Amino acid sequence: MNLEDPIGIIELGNVNLKCLIFQINKNNSSEILSTAITPSEGIHNDVVVNLTKASNAIRLSIGTAEKKAKISLKKINVVFEQPDFLCTKFSKHKKIDGSKIHRHDIEFLLKEAKKQLILNDKNQSIIHIFNHNYIVDGKIFMEEPIDVFADSLSHEMTFITVPKNNLKNINQVFIDCDIEIERLISHTFTLGVKLLNVRELQLGSALINLGYKKISLGLFKNLALVHSVTLPIGTDHITNDISK
């Protein structure tokens, strides 16, 4: 993708779908080309419950944004957050025996974590991997300790996964809309990047998002989302309970 190619993002929701088209200019500034907020149908807590209704709603949202921007998207980024999301943390260890740490050492630990995750639950698909700690001889490194001499290396990471069938249904909706999903993005992660500054993301922060049908909690540290959970309880449930 070229620097100035239009980029599309759609955020799934219970009430509305939000679509944004923008581009990154040569001076690295972003320019919004169009936005669209349209009614959501066939989607509950970002899970597709009716393929036909969801396809029609998403087609309308993307089409409205494309018409405003006077362009046609081939790919789009999808922002969503399901109560079925799983957050799994791993700490993998490797002996270095006084040698330098190389990139392939870190890649080995990452592959080992992914392998264990898949063995534990083959029905999950990975949408995010966050590297948040490297521990070299008992000392914490915030960045990759490439070329550092060490006896041991531990790599701490967090995986965000979603049930494969949930993902298949989302993919099918966008296939029916004749558009390819470029990337799947956690809504909690996007909120953290938007609302928290670098210091807050580095030192540690908690973010709670009260939605209409769900509540999401994200814990951030070392510039990573280290824990995330979404509950199928929202402001709608709270309001209904109070009114009784």
Where are these regions (language model features)?
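Active-site core segments that coordinate phosphate-bearing ligands/cofactors
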Residues: 244
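Nucleotide/phosphate-binding catalytic cleft detector across ATP-hydrolyzing
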Residues: 1-16, 20-75, 80-206, 224-226, ...
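Glycine-rich phosphate-binding loop of actin/hexokinase-like ATP-binding domains
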Residues: 203-241
